[in-house]
From Swiss-Prot:
Gene3D superfamilies referenced in this protein's UniProt entry, alphabetically: 1.50.10.20, 2.20.130.20, 2.60.120.1540, 2.60.40.1930, 2.60.40.1940, Alpha-macroglobulin, receptor-binding domain, Immunoglobulins
Matches recorded under Pfam families: A2M, A2M_BRD, A2M_recep, MG2, MG3, MG4, TED_complement
Keywords: Bait region, Disulfide bond, Glycoprotein, Protease inhibitor, Secreted, Serine protease inhibitor, Signal
Name the record gives this protein: Ovostatin
Subcellular location: Secreted
Native source organism of the sequence: Gallus gallus
Modification after translation, per record: Lacks the thioester bond found in other members of this family. Glycosylated; contains 56 glucosamine units per subunit.
Coiled coil start-end: none
Assembly, per entry: Homotetramer, which consists of two pairs of disulfide-linked chains.
Length: 1473
């Protein structure tokens, strides 16, 4: 060896030789030293790196070559406390021994240490390593009955807590809350627990909630939170599902593509209809350059199987051309035959230049010299589909080793003999085809990428290796497998040893779950294989890390570890199935559940359509396991804590090490291709004095383990119920009729908790709903010992092989006729003779148009029947249609002569027939109070002019309580829209007064309480949708620029009063109060902000005094004391103003009530005296009015007092009732006021508008509580000269019952007699329609129609153009409503309504009961307002009548205008009739 050159000949030796000699000499010296003393034994101590707090764990210990008595001690050091885990004397090597020990409880993530000592006569072994103690809390999951809800539906959900062994925990949840999309808390339940370990809760959604994602938040005692989201949207369940099947990708060389569209009903039958298909490729657009996409489109009928397959040429799309987007967009629109309903499905097809791809699979990243290296190469196409029978070239270190051919799965297995490979690294490359290196500008060339893999040689000091053969597929629970282990051992130290012990240890979820020992005879050969038997169980899920090791006499630990994926399973085995796979709707089916005895099983079954509408992350084994904080512990970094210990072995120089014929390069970091890496991957700490690491370089640059706590970095793999194609045939000569009447269509069918008996089985019978669909059921179960378990989904197809479907519009106008269509579906596998009958009725005349007679319907076909319907009267009209099979032989099918089953299906639907014109109402109210007396009175009901014939509906009612009518109608006090933040409060606030009044008078029943609280809950949810982020409220919420001071105060005080009955978020209230306080000026008065579209709410006066009085009242009614800073300053404002002359009556009434409510007697009395001067009296009653109207100013459409007058009068009444030292004389004065207020009530207990209803009911409730008499006994009789007589009895038991009767004639004169004691509230109501009146008051309105499209074979469509302006006496109107009644058979196009909001043309749009309601803000005097939207026909009405349009001031309804419009498609429709 030439180790010197030139002038360096003076060196004694070159550096390499010198180092070799030094190492040799050192080895000789060490050998002599070792001969002088007994060799120390080898040991292995194993403990999980993460110990789970307050639970048992395991430690495993082994000694090898032990030949003297030693004292062994293992200690857990934590928080200055040492806990002895293991302490004993031992003299022999007894193999691997494991024992349990208890981990102390901790409150947080804690660092601890395990110390090991072993003392003998000639040696003293010590090691100390870090571990982590993890505070393992229970984890919580939430399940809702559905993933999506409609407004007004109830949400049902469950909460379950499990420990880390998946056993149920009886948690007490301090708080379970529901948040809306704006993070407002709308429901909460405190200190919730359940003895069965399943909490089940239900709550309602308001009819008009905030749409979007809601959260259920569950808080545990520790403060840890779990959340679950669900969606609230307006939706219609899809009747069928549309799927597009197309290749996921195309290559630039593909010449065609096949697209298949299928439409299938949810009950599994094909859809009959047509499909519009378009396939498009877009250009890449740069700057302002926009090009239309290249498309192929067509429309075709679906085949009888509901599918359509079509082959398209790809030539037009120029797949290999640059300048286009690299995808095709497929869109399919399927429309049912003779229906408007359609569904759309889309798919994107990517375009790739990659013709094929190679990938190495099932390979190891290390090779062990002497053990064959196995692997697979997979060849796939652009869709990842296998390419078979192709030759793959494999290069090892850039040399072609062999050619391999792919099998039918596209896989080519390979093996490499490593016995003669010495390289520290192998470079593997797989090649299929070589890509063409020729490129043309503007064109995309195909490519065939190769695959590369780098494999490192595993380090072993003795060149001994163990390799566990991996399994690349998940193992299922209960499965028995034999695991193959390869080994090769260096013969050094085995001269006299024939049997070698191999040990194996399994880790899962951070615990030792498996240990064992295999004895192998190595006498014949030091390399070979052995098998480890493995029985998979739930303890090993979701991943088992298996370590196989042996202790080599040359003081090396030879090992390998591998990760096996295990099916996510549970100890509690749950099975769920329906007794049948298919059954008729409305029949009974059994749901059979099997689980561990005494389990409680939570079952859910939902309509498959729900899951089509919104796919959800179903509760599954996957989702439950994902909640476990330690699914698969790998490595030494957990939850930000680094548990890496310093290497025990001394470092070496940076020169390559030559040992046993191999060169090794020392590591420059602590991690390398060695056994330590396998041990580390187990997530276990290993204490050993055997070699496990590749040597590490001694340099300052050596990468040391980071500090224990990390701010970032990778973490250790943790994650926090008899149906077939036909019904079975009965014996010959016996005929059965299977009849169904369908009316129950839920979305969630089953939501139950079922107890499993001691046999481990339960069977529950359910009635299948009427929905023809597939039901998906699932169950999870909990039991204290068996723990948690869950079933795979079970399905039931609820189906009718024969049924009829009737389609009706929502309503029509009296005098119109329309076409009704019934479709009869036959899903039997043979033709049948049918009879279809529309039940005769006195309410309509029906004329069959087609077909001319009944006939046969063949298999998988439907038949349509059409009648022309002529309604005779008004009101709800019921249509009952029955379809039945009859006389099968008439269809000339010989094989069916012996069938003895008939089918009959009936469907009942209702249609509203409305009178023409506009609905109106007049009432007469009488509050009669007496004591043992008789009162008689004549009552006349006159008929107004311009009444639509047949529309008047007079009635008479009586109730024994001043609040009785309002209590019965608290949800419908006004027959007006409620689509904004002001109007919603009329649905909310009166419930508070009703509850408070009934509570004070001890009349509150559970039924009334439940109903009114339900309304409060709903109103609370809805009102939050009008809240701004700063805590204020406005009419249309965030659509308004800022919150409104007046409305915010109203909401604040109402929520405060409601908090006695329902949950109100304190944080919401606190934020609102802060906002109100910021609006107070230095003089104590409040500034007005925001636009309030109700001038009446402000008494028509734009001044800060009325606002300040109102806010002061609100804060006092909210429960704040006079010492509150805001209130104290507010009264400074009011007292200063009271020293001046306040002339406005509305402001006087407000200020009077404020001072009376605050107990300021002198000022209160002063204002009441002043108000008395302006009081009006009529028929013994007293009231106040804002401005006296002259006769010409009064509306021809309505005849009631101004709502402001009711409001003022009510405030005066409240002032009287709350004045300090109230006297009997005050109550007498109050009774006269009450008489006048009562006379203004409508038939539902409300008044003319919003604020007058709220304040008047508050005042009436206060008066009723102050004058309540518990004794009521009255007999009321009403009669007429035409033999009509009706007698009512009112007593203490039924005083809140609203008793009603229709009156026989109008116009008419009636006599009324009241006899007894107590008060009764009597009312006559006349509801009627009027023809559109001429003229207008306050508004102008015109309606135009345009852009009509009226084809014969498709639904008609046109635009409605509304042009209006305000012409009243004020500078602007209040909020305006335009009520557009839909023409019979037409519906609005939703997208056009949405556009009105998006363009800020209107503030709100509602579509209810065939009316489009458009909300406009204040309209300025004579300012033109134009609104346009589209309507389309969804039903054929053959002789349609005009539809009315009304515009009116919501708060001053006497200001109005009316108009009407007709369909531009009328001529075409009338020809069809």
């Amino acid at each position: 060896m030439h180790c010197f050159l030139g002038r360096e000949i003076l060196s004694f030796f070159c550096l390499t030789v010198r180092k070799m000699w030094l190492k040799f000499i050192l080895a000789i010296l060490l050998l002599h030293a070792a001969a002088g003393k007994e060799p120390e034994p080898q040991y292995v101590l194993m403990v999980p790196a993460v110990l789970q707090s307050d639970s048992p764990s395991q430690v495993c210990l082994q000694f090898f070559n032990l030949n003297q008595t030693i004292s062994v001690r293992v200690v857990l050091e934590y928080d200055t406390i040492n806990t002895t885990i293991f302490e004993k004397n031992t003299t022999t090597s007894n193999g691997l021994q494991c024992l349990n020990f208890m981990i102390p409880p901790v409150t947080s993530v804690s660092l601890a240490f395990i110390s090991f000592t072993a003392k003998g006569t000639t040696f003293d072994l010590k090691e100390r390593r870090s571990v982590m103690i993890w505070n393992m809390e229970s984890f919580v999951f939430v399940q809702t009955d559905k993933p999506i809800y409609k407004p007004g539906q109830s949400v049902m959900f469950r909460v379950v807590a499990l420990d880390f062994n998946f056993k149920p925990v009886q948690e007490m949840y301090p708080l379970i809350a529901v948040q809306d999309p704006q993070n407002n808390r709308i429901f909460q339940w405190q200190n919730v627990t359940s003895e069965i370990n399943i909490v089940q809760i239900e709550f309602p959604l308001t009819e008009e909630p905030i749409l979007g994602n809601y959260k259920i938040i569950v808080t545990k005692k520790s403060g840890e939170r779990t959340s679950h989201s669900f969606l609230v949207e307006e939706y219609v369940l899809p009747k069928f599902d549309v799927t597009v099947t197309a290749p996921g990708s195309l290559t630039v060389m593909d010449s065609e593509l096949t697209v298949k569209i299928c439409a299938v009903y949810t009950y599994g039958q094909p859809v009959e209809g047509k499909v519009q298909l378009s396939v498009c490729r877009d250009f890449d657009s740069y700057g302002r350059c926009k090009k239309s996409p290249v498309c192929q489109s067509f429309t075709k009928d679906l085949d009888t199987d509901g599918c359509l397959s079509h082959i398209l040429s790809s030539k037009v799309f120029e797949l290999n051309r640059i300048g286009y987007k690299r995808n095709l967009d497929v869109k399919a629109i399927v429309t049912e035959k003779e229906q408007v309903c359609n569904l759309t499905a889309t798919q994107s097809i990517s375009i790739t230049q990659v013709m094929s791809s190679l990938q190495f699979e099932n390979v190891d990243h290390h090779y062990r010299r002497g053990i064959p290296y196995f692997g697979q190469i997979k060849l796939v196409d652009k869709d990842n589909s296998p390419i078979s029978n192709k030759v793959i070239q494999l290069f090892v270190n850039n040399k072609n080793t062999h050619n391999f051919t792919t099998d039918i799965n596209g896989i080519a297995p390979f093996s490499i003999d490593t016995s003669k490979i010495f390289d520290p690294e192998l470079s593997l490359k797989a090649l299929y085809k070589t890509s063409d290196q020729c490129h043309s500008e503007g064109w995309i060339e195909p490519s065939y990428p190769d695959a590369s893999l780098s494999v490192q040689r595993l380090y072993s000091w003795t060149s001994s290796f163990v390799r566990i053969e991996p399994l690349w597929k998940d193992m299922s629970c209960g499965q028995k497998r034999m695991i193959t282990v390869y080994y090769i051992l260096n013969t050094e130290g085995y001269e006299h040893i024939n049997i070698v012990n191999f040990y194996y240890v399994g880790m899962a979820k951070g615990k030792i779950v498996l240990t064992g020992e295999i004895k192998v005879n190595i006498q014949a050969d030091q390399n070979g294989t052995f098998m480890i038997p493995l029985v998979v169980n739930e303890k090993m899920a979701p991943a088992l890390r298996l370590l196989v090791y042996m202790l080599h006499p040359a003081k090396e630990l030879v090992a390998d570890s591998v990760r096996f994926s295990i099916e996510k399973c549970f100890k509690n085995k749950v099975q769920l199935q329906f007794s049948e796979k298919q059954m008729l709707t409305t029949s009974n089916v059994s749901l059979v559940i099997e689980a561990a005895a005494n389990s409680f099983c939570a079952v859910r079954a939902v309509d498959k359509s729900m899951l089509l509408l919104k796919s959800e992350t179903e509760l599954s084994a996957e989702t439950i396991y994902n909640l476990h904080p330690i699914q698969d512990l790998q490595g030494y970094i957990f939850n930000g804590l680094n548990l890496e210990d310093d290497p025990q072995d001394p470092c070496v120089s940076s020169d390559d090490i030559f040992h046993k014929g191999l060169y090794y390069r020392p590591l420059t970091s602590g991690l390398g291709p060695d056994v330590y890496q396998f041990l580390r991957d187990m997530g276990m700490k290993f204490f050993t004095n055997s070699k496990i690491r590749q040597p590490t370089v001694c340099t300052r640059e050596t990468v040391r383990p980071p500090s224990y706590f990390l701010n970032a970095g990778f973490t250790a793999s943790t994650h926090h119920v008899k149906l077939s194609a036909e019904v079975a045939r009965e014996e010959r000569g016996k005929r059965h009729i299977l009849e169904t009447i369908r009316e129950f269509f839920p979305e969630t069918w089953i939501w139950d908790i079922i107890l499993i008996n001691s046999t481990g089985k339960a069977s529950v019978s359910y009635t299948i709903p009427d929905t023809i669909t597939e039901w998906k059921a699932s169950a999870f179960c909990v039991e204290e010992l068996a723990g948690f378990g869950m079933s795979v989904p079970a399905t039931l197809t609820a189906f009718q092989p024969f049924f009829v479907d009737l389609t009706l519009p929502y309503s029509i106008i009296h005098g119109e006729d329309f076409l009704v269509r019934a479709n009869v579906f036959n899903y039997l596998n043979h033709c049948i003779k049918i009879n279809v009958l529309l039940l005769e009725s006195l309410d309509y005349q029906a004329k069959l148009i087609s077909p001319e007679d009944d006939g046969c319907v063949c298999a998988k076909i439907r038949k349509s029947y059409v009648w022309n319907i002529f309604p005779k009267g008004t009101g709800d009209v019921l249509f009952s249609i029955t379809a039945e099979t009859n006389d099968d032989e008439a269809c000339e099918e010989e094989a069916l002569r012996n069938i003895r089953i008939d089918y009959r299906d009936t469907q009942i639907r209702a249609l509203l027939v409305e009178p023409e014109g506009i609905r109106r109402e007049e009432t007469q109210n009488f509050l009669i109070c007496m004591k043992d007396d008789v009162i008689s009175q004549d009552v006349a009901i006159d008929l107004p002019t311009n009444v639509v014939e047949g529309s008047p509906r007079p009635s008479f009612s009586v109730v024994g309580d001043i609040m009785g009518t309002a209590i019965q109608n608290v949800h419908q006090l006004l027959q007006m829209p409620f689509g904004n933040g002001e109007q919603n409060m009329v649905l909310f606030a009166p419930n508070i007064y009703v509850l408070d009044y009934l509570d004070k008078t001890r009349q509150l029943s559970e039924d009334v309480k439940s109903k009114t609280i339900g309304y409060l809950v709903s109103g609370y949810q809805k009102q939050l949708s009008y809240k701004h982020p700063d805590g204020s409220y406005s009419t249309f919420g965030i659509r308004d620029k800022e919150g409104n001071t007046w409305l915010t105060a109203f909401v604040y005080k109402s929520f405060a009063e409601a908090s006695r009955f329902i949950y109100i978020d304190d944080n919401v209230q606190a934020q609102t109060l802060i906002w109100l306080a910021t609006k107070q000026k230095t003089d104590g008065c409040f500034q007005s902000t925001g636009i309030l579209v109700n001038n009446a709410m402000k008494g028509g006066v734009e001044n800060e005094l009325s606002l300040s009085a109102y806010i002061t009242i609100a804060l006092l009614e909210a429960g704040h004391s006079m010492s509150h800073t805001v209130i104290r300053n507010a009264f400074y404002c009011l007292e200063t103003a009271s020293e001046k002359n306040i002339t406005d009556i509305y402001t006087q009434a407000l200020v009077a009530y404020a001072f009376c409510l605050a107990g300021k007697a002198e000022i209160c009395e002063s204002f009441l005296r002043e108000l008395q001067k302006s009081a009006k009296e009529v028929d013994g009653s007293k009231y106040w009015e804002q401005n006296q109207r002259s006769a010409p100013e009064k509306s021809h459409l309505l005849d009631h007092v101004q709502s402001t007058d009711v409001e003022i009068t009510s405030y005066v009444l409240l002032a009287l009732l709350y004045k300090p030292n109230r006297s009997q004389e005050d109550l007498t004065k109050a009774s006269a006021i009450v008489q006048w207020i009562i006379r203004q009530q409508n038939s539902y207990g409300g008044f003319a508008s919003m604020q007058d209803t709220v304040v008047a009911l508050q005042a009436l409730a206060a008066y009723g509580a102050a004058t309540y008499n518990s004794v009521t006994q009255n007999v009321i009789k009403i009669n007429s000269k035409n033999t009509f007589e009706k007698v009512f009895t009112v007593n203490n038991e039924n005083r809140l019952l609203l008793q009603q009767t229709p009156l026989p004639q109008v116009p008419g004169k009636y006599s009324l007699t009241v006899n007894g004691t107590g008060c009764v509230l009597i009312q006559t109501a006349l509801r009627y329609n009027i023809h559109l009146p001429e003229g207008a008051f306050g508004f102008s309105l015109s309606v135009q129609t345009s852009n009509a499209s009226c084809p014969r074979d498709q639904p008609g469509k046109f635009d409605i153009v509304l042009i209006s302006s305000y012409t009243g006496k004020r500078s602007s109107s209040n909020m305006v409503i335009i009520d557009v009644k839909m023409l019979s058979g037409f519906v609005p196009v939703k997208s056009s309504l949405d556009q009105l909001i998006d363009d800020h043309t209107v503030m709100q749009v509602e579509y209810k009961k065939n009316h489009v309601l458009l909300y406009l803000g204040n309209i300025l005097q004579k300012r033109r307002k134009e609104v346009t939207f589209s309507v389309e026909q969804d039903f054929v009405v053959t002789h349609p009548k005009p539809a009315p349009v009304q515009i009116y001031d919501y708060y001053e309804t006497e200001e109005y205008a009316v108009a009407e419009y007709m369909s531009l498609c009328r001529g075409v429709v009338e020809e069809m009739g």
